[in-house]
C-alpha cells in the first residue's frame, strides 16, 4: 500500500499509466543510487577481490537502470524523442542540443560511438 510520503499528489486520482511512470522513475533513481554506492565502495577498498565483487554488483545495477530507462523511452514520447536525440552520439552534447532545437525536422541521425 502506498503511503502519502511516496507521492506528491493524491495517487488515487492518478491513472495507472501515471502510477507506472512514477514507479519506473523511482526504480531508475534507486538503481542509480545503488550504482553510486557500489562504485564508492569499490574505489575505497584495498581488497582486490572485494573490489571485483563490488564492481560486478555496480555493473548489474547499471543494467537495471538502463532497463528502466528503456521502459520510460518506450512508454513516454518525450523520453523517446530526447533519447533518440542525445544517446549514442559523438561530439559536444550542447552542440547536439543546439542542432536539435534550431534545425527544422528531425534531429541529425545519431551514430553509435565506437568503443574500439
Where are these regions (language model features)?
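Iron-associated oxidoreductase/ferritin-like identity signal
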Residues: 1-116
Amino acid at each position: 500500500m502506498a503511503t502519502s510520503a511516496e507521492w506528491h499528489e493524491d495517487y488515487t486520482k492518478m491513472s495507472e499509466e501515471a502510477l507506472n511512470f512514477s514507479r519506473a522513475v523511482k526504480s531508475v533513481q534507486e538503481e542509480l543510487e545503488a550504482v553510486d554506492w557500489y562504485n564508492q565502495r569499490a574505489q575505497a577498498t584495498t581488497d582486490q577481490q572485494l573490489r571485483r565483487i563490488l564492481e560486478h554488483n555496480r555493473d548489474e545495477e547499471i543494467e537495471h537502470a538502463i532497463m528502466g530507462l528503456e521502459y520510460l523511452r518506450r512508454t513516454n514520447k518525450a523520453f523517446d524523442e530526447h533519447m533518440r536525440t542525445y544517446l549514442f552520439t559523438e561530439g559536444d552534447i550542447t552542440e547536439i542540443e543546439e542542432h536539435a532545437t534550431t534545425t527544422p525536422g528531425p534531429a541529425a541521425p545519431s551514430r553509435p560511438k565506437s568503443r574500439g
